[in-house]
Regions:
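N-terminal hydrophobic targeting/anchoring segments and the immediately downstream early-domain regions
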Residues: 1-134, 138
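Substrate-binding cleft of carbohydrate-active enzyme catalytic domains
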Residues: 138-144
Length: 144
């Protein structure tokens, strides 16, 4: 039997070297990191760039991961794999083509809405629930 992999399935924190090292000490193998709640494309690019600086500064403890193989490799190397995700698809704005751009930039989770109505779907705070929008269906098709 192989050892299990420990994944923190959703995290938002005041990231720092201390936290990165605590994750390693706690044997956290991977973290789904929120890089966008309601940010625009440009604001989210800035978040990715901040993470790229952290990857360069702390390569012994964290690494960007885009696949299950990346997570396994990080674990074998004693590093925590960082997986980018959105809590809301606002960074794709109204441009379907940005789905692929974000995929190439390492985003692997895209939640259609957070709490409020988005261009893609209804959030849990909305009184009426019309579900997934036309654009939401197009984005899902593009993601798949």
């Amino acid at each position: 039997m192989t050892e299990s992999i420990t994944i923190d399935c959703l995290q938002y924190a005041a990231w720092s070297e201390k936290i990165f090292r605590q994750m390693r000490q706690g044997n956290v193998d991977a973290v789904h990191v929120t890089i966008a709640y309601h940010e625009t494309f440009r604001e989210t690019v800035a978040n990715v760039e901040e993470w790229n600086r952290w990857f360069a500064a702390y390569p012994e403890v964290i690494v960007n991961a885009c696949s299950a193989a990346d997570v396994r490799t990080a674990r074998e190397q004693g590093r925590t794999a960082i997986i980018f995700g959105f809590q809301n698809c606002s960074p794709i704005e109204d441009d379907l083509g940005l789905v692929q751009v974000w995929h190439r930039m390492g985003v692997r989770f895209m939640q259609l809405s957070y709490n409020n109505q988005s261009l893609l779907a209804t959030g849990c705070y909305e009184r009426e629930d019309p579900g997934i929008t036309r654009m939401g269906r197009q984005v899902i098709k593009e993601m798949n």
